[in-house]
Amino acid sequence: KKSAKYCSLVGIVVSSIGAMIYYAASFVCSTEISILLSMVSTIYVTGAFHEDGFADVCDGLGGGWTKEKILLIMKDSRLGTYGVSGLVLILAIKFSALREIHPYLIPLTIISGHSVSRFIATTLIYTHPYVRDTADSKAKPAAKSISIGMLSINAFFGLLPLFFFKTPLILLVILPPYFAK
């Protein structure tokens, strides 16, 4: 229940592995191969946890018309056409976005992306009501137990990597969760 405060710190640890893989590979491989190896390493380290969740969301939103049907599809362990399509597209977008960044900034961008995204996810859990009403839910206890103190610790680790960029405009990434409610 108290692990939410370390969500962004976990993002820093996982992404540091990916950033180190990118950095080491960049000495012997092209930027493209280095990015792909970094992506593979973070997917492997997390057990494809986030990709599985994203595929479930794509399947649910693509195949369901009501809240109940969407949630039922998302709970189904099978991978559907919308999930596969979503995974291919999101990984292609991630690769393409990293490819557009100066190679020097890619490791910092990887670390920032992982920490900020986990901070945003935790913020949304804190600010929004839980969707599922059933008692057998896995995430509802975590969603109810996040305090402002836990969110503050998470914010510290989530936003820390942004301060290593040379422009204060990078801090604009924290605005979407603020306006999401």
Kindly label every feature range from the protein language model.
Residues 59:
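Carboxylate-dense, calcium-coordinating segments in secreted/extracellular and ER-lumen proteins
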Residues 49-53:
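Juxtamembrane transmembrane-helix boundary signature
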Residues 1-47, 63-68, 76-77, 82-181:
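Hydrophobic alpha-helical transmembrane segments
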